[in-house]
């Protein structure tokens, strides 16, 4: 099947069981990527749609690219949409969305994924290493409590050790938000770290 801008699969990270599952993109293509696809994924995978706390284990965080990611389309080739029940909104959290730019969405798309659905809650801190089709959950107790900069350095050094010496590692990209519990780190080989 021709996907016309889509990679054809979405990565579901079940943090409770530490399993990575590939979801077919086809049922979500009609939502167009980004906010539409993220909202559809949220409503399909969120088990309790009445939650009002973004930190609740039933919350689902969807990080979704678009069919234009990695293209030269101005203002569209590098945006990534994040959808779910927000954290820390006053007076209560609610279903919301945000987006960010940079190379994350492009690199995720190049790795063969149209998005990531994160659900559940890990029983201890973990980070998830995504390199193209391979997904590995790593213990992250040594990162817990560190600030953003220290976390970046620690994961970057770990990624270098995990990579082959013949590969280039000069192109690291960090997007880490330790306070809210989510950290992502794509590299040229597309590693994404997610600490919960």
Predicted segments, located by residue:
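Extended, non-catalytic structural segments that build the interaction scaffolds
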Residues: 77-98, 185
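Conserved oxyanion/phosphate-binding beta-strand-loop segments in alpha/beta enzyme cores
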Residues: 43-79
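Short, basic and Ser/Thr-rich N-terminal targeting/leader segments
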Residues: 4-6, 56-59, 178
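Active-site cavity-forming subdomains of large catalytic enzyme subunits
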Residues: 94-95, 105-196
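Short helix/loop capping segments that flank catalytic or ligand/cofactor-binding pockets
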Residues: 21, 71-74, 170, 193-194
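N-terminal leader/transition segments
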Residues: 1-28, 32
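Non-catalytic, usually N-terminal nucleic-acid engagement modules in DNA/RNA processing proteins
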Residues: 24-55
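Thiamine diphosphate
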Residues: 101-102
């Amino acid at each position: 099947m021709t996907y016309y801008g889509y990679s054809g699969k979405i990565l579901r990270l079940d943090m409770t069981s530490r399993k990575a599952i590939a979801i077919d993109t086809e049922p979500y293509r009609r939502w167009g990527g980004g906010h539409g696809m993220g909202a559809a994924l949220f409503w399909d995978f969120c088990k309790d749609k009445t939650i009002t706390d973004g930190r609740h284990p039933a919350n689902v965080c969807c990080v979704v690219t678009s069919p234009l990611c990695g293209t030269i389309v101005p203002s569209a080739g590098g945006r990534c949409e994040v959808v779910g029940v927000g954290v820390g909104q006053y007076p209560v959290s609610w279903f919301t969305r945000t987006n960010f730019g940079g190379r994350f969405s492009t690199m995720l798309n190049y790795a063969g994924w149209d998005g990531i659905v994160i659900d559940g809650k890990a029983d201890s801190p973990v980070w998830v290493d995504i390199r193209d089709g391979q997904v590995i959950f790593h213990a992250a107790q040594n990162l817990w409590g560190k600030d953003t900069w220290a976390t970046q350095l620690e994961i970057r050094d770990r990624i270098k050790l995990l990579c082959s010496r013949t590969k280039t590692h000069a192109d690291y990209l960090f997007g880490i938000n330790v306070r809210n519990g989510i950290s992502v780190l794509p590299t040229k080989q597309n590693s994404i770290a997610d600490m919960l």
